[in-house]
A protein has these predicted regions:
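Charge-dense, helix-prone N-terminal extensions
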Residues: 2-161
Length: 161
């Protein structure tokens, strides 16, 4: 016999066990001291600056997840079930990923000449999967943040003035 469960119960169980879109959400969000220890002081400041730049232009839901097999943590910016970008952290390294769909790749080509050669090279070297081109940047400073904001604007118009 199949037992039908109320939707409220199912949502509660999903939240309780921490599954969100296939990701494993963290029960304990890493503290500033944990992140500083993991990244080092200078990279933690870069992480904070990148988050501030995104937060300044976008009102998004932020989700902490495990970082999978290659990273310690993932910090995802989402709205309406769609991911804008994800930040990743592991020992002395930051990752910043944007996934470009087919239409977004066309928009990238339209602004390519306004972007740095470093950003364009990283884009060109990224693999294309069935759901898009997965571009991973590893910022060590804030030099390319203006370029990153242009890339995010391809994905979604800023919703903060």
């Amino acid at each position: 016999m199949i037992k039908v469960l109320p939707v409220k119960f199912i949502i509660y169980r999903i939240e309780q066990i921490g599954i969100c879109g296939g990701d494993i959400m963290l029960e304990n969000i890493p503290s500033q001291s944990i992140m500083t220890e993991l990244l080092g002081q200078s990279l933690y400041e870069v992480w904070q600056a990148l988050c501030s730049s995104i937060d300044e232009k976008y009102d998004m839901e932020q989700l902490w997840n495990t970082g999978g097999k290659n990273w310690t943590y993932e910090y995802k910016y989402r709205r309406g079930g769609k991911t804008l970008c994800s930040l990743y952290a592991k020992s002395n390294c930051i990752g910043f990923m944007i996934i470009f769909g087919k239409d977004e790749r066309t928009k990238f080509e339209a602004i390519r000449n306004t972007l740095s050669t470093v950003v364009c090279r990283q884009y060109d070297e990224a693999k294309i999967y069935r759901d898009g081109k997965w571009v991973m940047f590893e910022p060590a400073n804030t030099a390319d943040f203006d370029n990153y904001m242009k890339l995010l604007a391809i994905k979604r118009k800023p919703n903060r003035k």
